[in-house]
C-alpha cells in the first residue's frame, strides 16, 4: 500500500463536521450542560424556552434561544445527533452562511406559528401545550426543504425503502420517542420547511452575492481559518467543485495498491511479440499441389502453418496459420495424404524449405 503524504487527511478516522453545525451543537451543550450536570434535580424552568408570555414580556430573544435548550440528558444526546445528521447535510448543500441564516429564519417562523397555536389552544381550553425547546423544529424545517427539492424518489428509513415524500412524516412520528420534546413545535417546523420548499420564497432568501460578501466578514472569516472543521463556501460553483473532488479524488491523494503498469497504447504489438524487434514473416504463397515455402527459424514467434488438402476440390490445398504458442510435441511421421498436416516452422530449416521431407505433426 502506498503511504499517504504527511499533509493528507487520514481516511475514515473521523467524518468532516461543518463549522456551523459544530458550533450549534457546542452552543447547545454550553447552554444546557451546566443545568443538566451541575444543578440538583428537579430543575427550575429555563428562562430561554419558548412560552406564550415571551411576547407579552417582550422577551423576543426566546424566539431563537429555545433551540439550544434541553431539559433531559437523553434529549440532549438526541439533539446532538439530529444536529449532526440533518443540519450538517443542509449546511453542505447551501453553505455555512446560508445555513446560519436559515437556522434563525426557521426558528423564528416556527416559534411564531407555535405561539399562535398555543394561544388558540389556551382560548379554546383544549389543554396545556408543552413548551417548545430543542433543535428538532429547525431540523424538520430543513428536512422539509430538502425533501421537496430533492430529485430522489426513494430513501432508506429504518431499513425500509420508502418514497422520499414520506420520510419527514415517518421521522415526525418517531420524534414522539424523544423525551420532553414538543410535538406541536415539530409540526410547525415541518410546515415551514415544506412551505418554503414549494413556494421558493425569494423575498426572505439570501442571495449568493450577499453570502459571498458575508464569507469575508466576522465571524465567518474566523470560522474559515479553523482547519479542523469544514467551512462550506457560499459559492455554488465552489460547492460543486468540492463535491466533484470528493467523488473523483486526485490521483495520489488516497492510498492505492501498487500493481504492474499496463502496456501503453504507444507500444506496437510487434514489440510484445518479438523481443528483438523483428517483424513477423509474411504469409507464404501456395499453389494447388505445391508444398508451401516455410519461413526461417523464429523461436520467439512460435508460428506454424497448417496445410489442408480438402479445399474446394480434392487437389487444392489451403494454408493458414495455427494458434501461436500451441505445442503438441514431435510425433512420428504420418502419410502425406493425411486429412490435416502441420508443417512446423520451428522444425524446418532454410535448406529444407523447398523439399517435401519437412517434419509433419498431425492435428487432432
Swiss-Prot record:
InterPro entries: Peptidase_S54_rhomboid_dom, Rhomboid-like_sf. Signal peptide: none annotated. Residues 267-276, 317-329 have a biased composition (Polar residues). It is found in: Golgi apparatus, cis-Golgi network membrane. It comes from the Eukaryota. SUPFAM superfamilies: Rhomboid-like. One of its GO terms (cellular component) is endoplasmic reticulum membrane. The chain crosses the membrane at residues 11-31, 63-83, 100-120, 158-178, 184-204. Keywords: Golgi apparatus, Membrane, Transmembrane, Transmembrane helix. It holds the Pfam family Rhomboid. It is a multi-pass membrane protein. GO terms for biological process: endoplasmic reticulum unfolded protein response; ERAD pathway. Residues 242-282, 317-364 are annotated as: Disordered. GO terms for molecular function: serine-type endopeptidase activity; signal recognition particle binding. Belongs to the peptidase S54 family. This is Rhomboid domain-containing protein 2.
Amino acid at each position: 500500500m502506498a503511504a499517504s503524504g504527511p499533509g493528507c487527511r487520514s481516511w475514515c478516522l473521523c467524518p468532516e463536521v461543518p463549522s456551523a453545525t459544530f458550533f450549534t451543537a457546542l452552543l447547545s451543550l454550553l447552554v444546557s450542560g451546566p443545568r443538566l450536570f451541575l444543578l440538583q434535580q428537579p430543575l427550575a424552568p429555563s428562562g430561554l424556552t419558548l412560552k406564550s408570555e415571551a411576547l407579552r414580556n417582550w422577551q423576543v430573544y426566546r424566539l431563537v434561544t429555545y433551540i439550544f435548550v434541553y431539559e433531559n440528558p437523553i434529549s440532549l444526546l438526541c439533539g446532538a445527533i439530529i444536529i449532526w445528521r440533518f443540519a450538517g447535510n443542509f449546511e453542505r448543500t447551501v453553505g455555512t452562511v446560508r445555513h446560519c441564516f436559515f437556522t434563525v429564519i426557521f426558528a423564528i417562523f416556527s416559534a411564531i406559528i407555535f405561539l399562535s397555536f398555543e394561544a388558540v389552544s389556551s382560548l379554546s381550553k383544549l389543554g396545556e401545550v408543552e413548551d417548545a425547546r430543542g433543535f428538532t423544529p429547525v431540523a424538520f424545517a430543513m428536512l422539509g426543504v430538502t425533501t421537496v427539492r430533492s430529485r430522489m424518489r426513494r430513501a432508506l428509513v429504518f431499513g425500509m425503502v420508502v418514497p422520499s415524500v414520506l420520510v419527514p412524516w415517518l421521522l415526525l412520528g418517531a420524534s414522539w420517542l424523544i423525551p420532553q420534546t414538543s410535538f406541536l413545535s415539530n409540526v410547525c417546523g415541518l410546515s415551514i420547511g415544506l412551505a418554503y420548499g414549494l413556494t421558493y420564497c425569494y423575498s426572505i432568501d439570501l442571495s449568493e452575492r450577499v453570502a459571498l460578501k458575508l464569507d469575508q466578514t466576522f465571524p465567518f472569516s474566523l470560522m474559515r481559518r479553523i482547519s479542523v472543521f469544514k467551512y462550506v463556501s457560499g459559492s455554488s460553483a465552489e460547492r460543486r467543485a468540492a463535491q466533484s473532488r470528493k467523488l473523483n479524488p486526485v490521483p495520489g491523494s488516497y492510498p492505492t495498491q501498487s500493481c504492474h503498469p499496463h502496456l501503453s497504447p504507444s507500444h506496437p504489438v510487434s514489440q510484445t511479440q518479438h523481443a528483438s524487434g523483428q517483424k513477423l514473416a509474411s504469409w507464404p504463397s501456395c499453389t494447388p499441389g505445391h508444398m508451401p515455402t516455410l519461413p526461417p527459424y523464429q523461436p520467439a514467434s512460435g508460428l506454424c502453418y497448417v496445410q489442408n488438402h480438402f479445399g474446394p476440390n480434392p487437389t487444392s490445398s489451403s494454408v493458414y496459420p495455427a494458434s501461436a504458442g500451441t505445442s503438441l510435441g514431435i510425433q512420428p511421421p504420418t502419410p502425406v495424404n493425411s486429412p490435416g498436416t502441420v508443417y512446423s516452422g520451428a522444425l524446418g530449416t532454410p535448406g529444407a524449405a523447398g523439399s517435401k521431407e519437412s517434419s509433419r505433426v498431425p492435428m487432432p
